[in-house]
Amino acid sequence: MKILLANPRGFCAGVSRAVETVEKVLEVEKSPVYVRHEVVHNKVVVDSLKKKGVVFVKEVDEVPDDAVCIFSAHGVSLQVEEAASKKNLVLYDATCPLVTKVHRGVRLASNNDAECVLIGHKGHPEVQGTMGQYRSEKGAIYLVESEQDVAKLDIKNPDNLYYATQTTLSVDETQGIIESLKNRFPNIKGPKKEDICYATQNRQTAIKSMLKEIDVLVVVGSQNSSNSNRLKELATLEGIDAYLVDNPADIKSTWFENKKVCGVSAGASAPEYLVQQVITEISRVCEGDVVVEEFDGIKEEVYFPLPRLLKQKIIGTN
């Protein structure tokens, strides 16, 4: 059997920055180090950081006063920021810069008393953080997940309206909803196209480009990873068997019976070493009869610098 490796795959710049932030904070600060929410949606990464002394909490209320705390890559609401400030925490913000861009857009809309529509998945931590950027008493922020939701919107002033999107959605996922918004509210304003997360789109494009070449797909990523689930869905929608795995132990030999080409990719929160371990396990269950090839794709060269406070601490300790 042949294994085709999707490109790009795995860690995006925002995830790399978040994980590196936690690891560097562990070096420059005294334990324990608290992280609000899973820093990224990957069980293996989170478990590894727990072993190094990181304490993950759901809310800042669980963090002792004056302690060291990190915000996850998904970002937080203004209410969470204020709660952290009251506790006098040593705070490092690992929010993805692309999420921060979305936050700025929503806050600007709020400051202008414009109502806001957010395209995203209900309950996702990024969505909760973005919704929590809106404070205007003269308007509201609405969450839509489908074109049907757009039809139900009751907007107070359609001439002063803004929309934003969850970063882990792709252009393909949001296109129909955005068109529905523009059809119903012709004066609605939105972000620039380049504000859309490059990583989500690139990883989905990579999968789409190899679908005609494969008859089974394995995606390395956790069940609670939005972008990993989308990668799997791209294959299943085309009638291709697809599986989402946290680690090599999830691999089953029956998946590859009578299969000729297996595609392998990874969500934006999955490290490359996990991908290589999964490949090794696939080769083992296929009794070594495997050839591995890289599938050509977009080359990513995006880098996000560490939080300013952390860079200052690193310089101060050297």
Swiss-Prot record:
InterPro entries: LytB/IspH
Binding residues for (2E)-4-hydroxy-3-methylbut-2-enyl diphosphate: 41, 74, 124, 167, 225-227, 269
Pathway this chain belongs to: Isoprenoid biosynthesis; dimethylallyl diphosphate biosynthesis; dimethylallyl diphosphate from (2E)-4-hydroxy-3-methylbutenyl diphosphate: step 1/1; Isoprenoid biosynthesis; isopentenyl diphosphate biosynthesis via DXP pathway; isopentenyl diphosphate from 1-deoxy-D-xylulose 5-phosphate: step 6/6
Record-linked CDD domains: lytB_ispH
Family: Belongs to the IspH family.
Function field: Catalyzes the conversion of 1-hydroxy-2-methyl-2-(E)-butenyl 4-diphosphate (HMBPP) into a mixture of isopentenyl diphosphate (IPP) and dimethylallyl diphosphate (DMAPP). Acts in the terminal step of the DOXP/MEP pathway for isoprenoid precursor biosynthesis.
Protein name: 4-hydroxy-3-methylbut-2-enyl diphosphate reductase
Origin species: Francisella philomiragia subsp. philomiragia (strain ATCC 25017 / CCUG 19701 / FSC 153 / O#319-036)
Encoding gene (name): ispH
